Amino acid sequence: GQRVGYLSWQPDKPGAQMLRTIVPSTLLSVLIITLLCLFMVRRIWTSSLSLSQSLVRLGASEAQAQHLAFHDVLTGLPNRALVEDRLTQALAAALRHDRRVALLLLDLDRFKNINDTWGHHAGDELIREVARRLSEIVRTSDTVGRIGGDEFIIVMPDTETIGQVHTLAQRIISALSAPYHLLGNELWVGVSIGLALAPKDGVDRLELMRKADIALYDAKNHGRGQFRQFEKAMDESLRTRQELAAELRQALVNFTGLAVWYQPLMEINGERVVGVEALLRWHHPTRGDISPADFIAIAEETGLILPLGEWVLREACKTSLKLPQVVVAVNVSPVQFRSSGFVSRLLEIVASEGADPQRLELEITEGVLIEDEHAARSSIIALREAGFRIALDDFGTGYSSLNYLSSFPVDKIKIDRSFTQSLGVADNSTAIIESVVRLGHAMGLTVTAEGVETEGQMHALANAGCNQLQGYLFSHAVPLTEIEKMV
């Protein structure tokens, strides 16, 4: 239990001196660690913020892509995909709740003229304005979409009455037919509308759209600027037209059943033939005689009017050589007139047949002139310089007959048969015809009256001062052999 020794430690530096050495190093280390932590925290926060912003941008891009996938770029309206989806949903809801859905297909009339005359920028502006007008007319529950260049579609869910749909269609026609003041110009278009109603016309989306399209086709064929509701007869009529188109194409292979007949143009006393009009006839092997009003329209729609028109022109050239004492008139379709190289092709045909252009008269309608006035005027001038006579057919039934007389160099006006038929029926009919005749003569034009069927009409037209008469009173269209006996 006795202490035998002890240990003693004597530091090199006393405690106070050690603290003065250790504390600064420790504080510096703590500061460095703190700064490193703050730097790391800042990097993490910055990265998080950047990631958040990237996610926001990605979300916006996805939203924009989603919008573009289902909306028209030009107008912002729903596109075909979105409209079809909403139509499918509306049809499903209508079946569940025993409601009706209306579908309207719209096609602008004469829109191509805007693009051709004023350029695509004007066309785009007009499309935007059409979209705006449509959006203002429909209900908030309706869907307005753009499904093509000048094609629009409207889905009307929960339709109460068909009268409600008809009222909307008429409002659309009125709104879209009003003038458009764009880029310093006043522009005009019309609209044709086809209607189909579910479940009456079908409960399938594709079937309903097909029937609305058939109704739209019917609206166009009845003069445009109107609406048509689908009827079963329209479907049957369309099938018949498609069959006739195929059969007409086959007939053109060797012109089987096709013939050119001629109706005489008489001098004012009805005693002498001064000209003949070439009129196409088609005798179908099983259907019999097909009305020109039917197959000519089909030929224009399908483009068959081009080879058909050339064939008629060749036949007319041959007839002009057989009947050198009269002028042979040939109708020129608007489709023909506007086709590329029309004038040069016509001159080639006449030259190849050895015909004299001065013995040929080309009949055009006002519809030819309104499409592209500058191009139409150039073509007419070229044709007249080549020796052809130009007649303005169906005068008085178009948009601005008097304006065209002063703007286009024609040789003859043909008063439409509707004015002739009104003689003795409408109080102002005689005064109208007399005014047209005076105007024509003042401009140095020949005036022909069409549709003369009675002696009374002939005398009234003679008293009005017409130069030539044409109609059933003198002769229907007959084969060339019959005309040769009359000349």
Give the predicted meaning of each segment:
Residues W9-V30:
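Membrane-interface helix-start motif
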Residues Q66, F70, G76-L103, D109-R139, ...:
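Conserved long alpha-helical elements within nucleotide-processing catalytic cores of c-di-GMP signaling
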Residues A65, D72-L74, V83, L87-A90, ...:
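Hydrophobic scaffolding residues in well-structured cytosolic catalytic/regulatory domains
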Residues V144, R171, A175, H181, ...:
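Cyclic nucleotide signaling catalytic output domains
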Residues R99, G145-I147, I162-H166, L176-S192, ...:
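Catalytic core regions of nucleotide second-messenger enzymes
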Residues K232-E236, T240-A355, T365-V368, I381-A382, ...:
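Bacterial c-di-GMP phosphodiesterase EAL domain
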